[in-house]
């Protein structure tokens, strides 16, 4: 029978890269049996949000954009980073407006999950936005090119290729009883 898992001890920690896009550190660790695990790389991102937005007809408002890491153009939920001092709820409302020009008076928190607890420090906060209506034009960051689509919920989960986008969809479908 194997030993019970236990937290490692961090012996040393150093920043490897820190710029506007990637905060990477290297930890030198030791497990409870004294084995060295070094370096262990950790990405220190801030929290993210993921929003499944529905219009008044319960159709999904989704975004489509190029994702360079995977080298694909993909459909996804509305998402982005939580700014310092901003609540996840405020970030969800802000990203919905910026990426799509839509807003909702019924933003429902669906819980949070770890982005990747193996080597990320951040969580993904999942939201359902109901009764969304277009109130503005998109307000995109430099380098963003995002198409907005209104699609049926039927089969949408199969079209979402990012894991936390799928999880947001599943959590929303569960909340809606579908």
Locate predicted features:
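Beta-rich strand-turn-strand
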Residues: 85-90, 99-106
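Nudix hydrolase/Nudix homology domain
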Residues: 2-8, 73, 84, 113, ...
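Active-site-adjacent beta-strand/loop module that shapes the phosphate/pyrophosphate-binding cleft
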Residues: 25-33, 117-135, 149
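Short loop segments at secondary-structure junctions
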Residues: 32-34, 55-57, 66, 129-134, ...
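Acidic pyrophosphate-coordinating catalytic loop
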Residues: 15-20, 113-124
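Conserved Nudix-box catalytic region and its N-terminal flanking loop in Nudix hydrolases
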Residues: 3-7, 43-45, 49-94, 142
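Acidic, metal-coordinating catalytic segment for phosphate/diphosphate chemistry
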Residues: 11-50, 56
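A short coil-to-beta-strand element that immediately follows conserved catalytic motifs
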Residues: 9, 103-110
């Amino acid at each position: 029978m194997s030993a019970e898992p236990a937290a490692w001890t961090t012996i040393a920690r150093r920043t490897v890269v820190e710029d506007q896009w990637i905060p990477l550190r290297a930890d030198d660790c030791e497990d409870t049996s004294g084995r060295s695990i070094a370096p262990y790389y950790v990405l220190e991102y801030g929290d993210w949000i993921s929003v499944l937005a529905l219009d008044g007809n319960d159709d999904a408002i989704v975004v489509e954009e190029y994702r360079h890491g995977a080298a694909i153009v993909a459909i996804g939920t509305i998402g982005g980073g939580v700014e310092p001092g901003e609540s996840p709820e405020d970030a969800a409302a802000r990203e919905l407006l910026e990426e799509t020009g839509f807003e909702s008076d019924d933003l429902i928190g669906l819980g949070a999950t770890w982005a990747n607890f193996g080597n990320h420090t951040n969580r993904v906060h999942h939201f359902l936005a109901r009764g969304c209506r277009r109130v503005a034009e998109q307000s995109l960051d430099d380098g963003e090119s995002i198409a907005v689509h209104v699609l049926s919920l039927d089969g949408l989960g199969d079209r979402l290729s990012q894991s936390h986008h799928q999880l947001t969809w599943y959590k929303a479908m569960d909340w809606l009883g579908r």
